[in-house]
Amino acid sequence: MPLLNVDQHGYLSTGLSPNASGGYAEQVLAQSSLIFEVPNGLDADSAAMTEPMAVALHAVRRSRVKTSEPAIVVGCGPVGLGVILMLKAAGVKTVVASDFSPNRRKLAEQCGADIVVDPKETSPFANWKEFGLLGNVSDAINMGMGLFDKLQATRLPWWHGWRMIDKLGALPKRPVIFECVGVPGVLQQIIEGAPLFSRIVGVGVCMQSDKIEPALAINKELEIQFVLGYTPLEFRDALHMIAEGKVNCSPLITGVVGLEGVTSAFEALRDPEQHAKILIDPKRSGSDIQLMKH
């Protein structure tokens, strides 16, 4: 794990502090207790994906998504693609992926997304009726009161019937929406489009101020939560999921470059049609990016 215990400073993230430097160096100081053995002869390229996959695993676990609940991933960069992989590994039956980039949508399909949409043409929330979701308060009131009327017509006390239906999971599904963009305005767009009772999970890191309309989220009874990082157990589990073939993260690796090419790699990553994730190999010479074909 990229953490270093630096005396009075405690644990610091490697490469993000002067006291725990070495993010892009030939050698880096590692915490011996946080070194994990790579299992099953896993290749170095795949093992290097453990950290971003641990982030995705943490997001999926914290979301409490059920296998029967539709999951919607907004943004198919490396974070979103990792979330798609972990959702499918968790057994989620329906994963919808949304991105403007044709290349990213193609990668989302390779990662296991069941439905891929271009938000310029189709909202990722357009098919909510097909998934048994509720789109507005009026639908919820009519559904609830219709159920209430039917239960009152039975011999059993209606509240017992309601509890039984709730226990059996027969009430409307609650979709889980993963915001993996991290750009101001996206969270508000999701709130506007999300079906009732959705759970929104903020995975993308927005570094700027943003605005949302709480009243709209209240009327839809939305849950909004944010996630960060991972635990040592999730880091270990992500590594073993990759090694055991439960997660195939190779579609994310679109290029490899040496240390001399780090600057050009960041420039290349600006174009979503070119790359998703570029691995840095300190042993590789030259600044050219080697394209990976899958």
Across the structure, where does each feature detected by a protein language model lie?
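Glycine-rich phosphate/adenylate-binding loop and adjacent beta-alpha elements
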Residues: 1-35
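A glycine-rich, Thr/Ser-enriched phosphate-binding loop motif common to dinucleotide/cofactor-binding enzymes
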Residues: 19-22, 40-61, 74-82
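Short helix-loop-beta connector
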Residues: 42-43, 64-70, 172
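Adenosine-nucleotide cofactor-binding segment
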Residues: 73-76, 88-185
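Residues in the short beta-alpha loop(s) of Rossmann-like NAD(P)-binding domains
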Residues: 100-101, 206, 230, 283
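C-terminal hydrophobic helical "lid"/dimerization subdomain
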Residues: 144, 163-166, 188-192, 232-294
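ADP-ribose/adenylate-binding Rossmann-like module
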Residues: 176-179, 192-210, 224-225
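Rossmann-fold dehydrogenase core element
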Residues: 199-201, 212-252
